[in-house]
A protein has these predicted regions:
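Iron-sulfur-associated redox domains of electron-transfer enzymes in respiratory
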Residues: 1-170
């Protein structure tokens, strides 16, 4: 299904070799002040990050309604496969949201990483905590994009009848 959809693949070790060949030391570079990633977006790389982001966005969209996100977070291909098989076989689960990361620990534990997953998870969490934006809807760049579609505020989007129907499902 993906033939022709992927041009190249580059892992962290290969990227590290490119930086080394070009004499680029990332730790010596000045931080970019244009980074507008939300806390949730920054946490995607570790197990539980997607669930956290979804929960914060859902609560941002419907602040007056308590929506209990019961996430089941699994990592590793075998665990993901097991959860999918269990669901397909009709096994009950209390979760209403499933997050499956193919790599152990999430992307931070992927193949050819250059630091161990535990250390990478801590770095990802620290990076996330540095964000002053909780959700994408608190990001001025996202609001500019929504404006291009004729949506001037989150409240306006939430008053859209189709969106209300989608979010009102139990």
């Amino acid at each position: 299904d993906l033939v022709g959809a992927i041009d190249y693949v580059l892992n962290f070790r290969e990227l590290q070799e490119i930086f080394k060949a070009l004499n680029i030391n990332l730790e010596e570079l000045q931080p970019d002040d244009k980074d507008h990633a939300s806390l949730g977006g920054r946490l995607y790389a570790r197990t539980g990050g997607v669930s956290f982001s979804v929960k914060t966005v859902v609560n941002r969209l419907e602040p007056t309604r308590v929506i209990k996100l019961r996430a089941k977070k699994v990592d590793g291909v075998k665990e993901c496969r097991k959860v999918l098989d269990d669901l397909q076989n009709g096994e009950k689960d209390d979760a209403n949201f499933f997050e499956g990361m193919g790599c152990t620990g999430g992307c931070v534990g992927g193949p050819r990483t250059i630091i161990d997953a535990e250390k990478a998870t801590k770095l990802v969490n620290d990076f996330g905590e540095d964000s002053y934006i909780l959700t994408p809807f608190d990001n001025m760049n996202i609001l500019k994009i929504l404006n291009q579609f004729g949506i001037n505020s989150i409240e306006e989007m939430m008053n859209n009848e189709e969106m209300r129907k989608l979010l009102s499902r139990e």
